[in-house]
Amino acid sequence: MDVIGRKKVLVAMSGGVDSSVTAALLLEQGYEVVGVTMQIWDPKIEVIGEEYVGCCSIYAVNDARRVADRLGIPYYVLNFRELFERKVIDYFTEEYLRGRTPNPCIACNRYIKFDALLKKALSLGMDYMATGHYARVVYKDDIGKYGLFRGVDRKKDQTYVLYNLTQDMLRRLLLPLGEYTKEQVRELARKYNLVTADKPESQEICFVPDNDYRKFLKERRGEEIKPGNFVDVNGRVLGQHQGYPYYTIGQRKGLGLALGKPYYVVDIRPETNEVVIGEASEIFSPGLIASDLNFLWFDEIPERFEAQAQIRYNAKPQPAVVERIGKDKVKVVFNEPQRAITPGQAVVFYRGDELLGGGTIEKRL
């Protein structure tokens, strides 16, 4: 029987153990829970075979539905294909054509999960939306705003891909897994007798099931990708590449060169169709320029502040000085040079466990 005043929450269910336990925990806490999975697949991708069970595949939908049945909650599949194609897949391919390395998870969180899906939840009369991310939303009494903090499981922390959240999003967001470790989550799934309890994690890009992004780019934009030259930092031709979108900063393997010593991708030049390669020392940089910024609770970006800056998902944050150099642009100078700063990736700023905000890396210094 429904309890008067019960808060309603829409749980984004990917078919994995994390979102399954999120739904179970919130139900146990007394929320009225509705489960949804976002249908984001191109029909051509859906028929790739039963071996793929990653996030939001048709097999993941089946797992999410079984969990919802087990918990006794309503469950729906919502069609976000067109929006996902436009905001995530088109962005993904276009960034590579610009000589940059995209982060599709950040784009998905920004435009799909925490924008379109949250708006859908509110339109359906939900009070909150919840996901299985490992992070913690905390109300900061001293400033009257919400902050985002790392999850207690530092190995699983996902705040890096959540820096685009706004105050309006944070006040409607529940992240119950921020207080648990991954092993504790699996133990809870076994306790609740969920079919996803021992399901392995998906490591690939969700819309590139075999994780071969080069093949994906070739199928989508192959007519625009042409061979060109590998050059050193002085412009000397060292060989031929297969197309600059197939490479990323810091890459060593797969260059197809025999030069007697290791070479790494140092820069990508779309305008001349060149991939610059160099020795290990040449992929280190003192800092970067970032734009397209979002800070979770700053009214205005300070002219200058110190923070721990993280330049890729699994990187360790490094001490840096951040200087505002425009309305939507900052310069970040690290205490020590950093390896393989990559345009297109995110730089995210922390103070201790608190996420301050972040932006997109435009170039290295």
UniProtKB/Swiss-Prot annotation:
Renumbered to this chain, region (Interaction with tRNA) spans 156-158, 312-313
- Residue(s) at site: Interaction with tRNA: 133, 345
The chain's disulfide connectivity reads 108-206
Question: One GO CC annotation, please?
Answer: cytoplasm
InterPro entries in UniProt: MnmA-like, MnmA-like_C, MnmA-like_central, MnmA-like_central_sf, Rossmann-like_a/b/a_fold
Q: What is its main location?
A: cytoplasm
Single GO term (MF): tRNA binding
Question: Which residues carry out catalysis?
Answer: 108, 206
> Could you tell me the Gene Ontology terms of the biological process aspect for this record?
tRNA wobble position uridine thiolation
Subcellular location per the Swiss-Prot or TrEMBL entry: Cytoplasm
Q: What is its EC number?
A: 2.8.1.13
EC class of the enzyme, as a word: transferase
Name it: tRNA-specific 2-thiouridylase MnmA
Q: Which gene encodes it?
A: mnmA
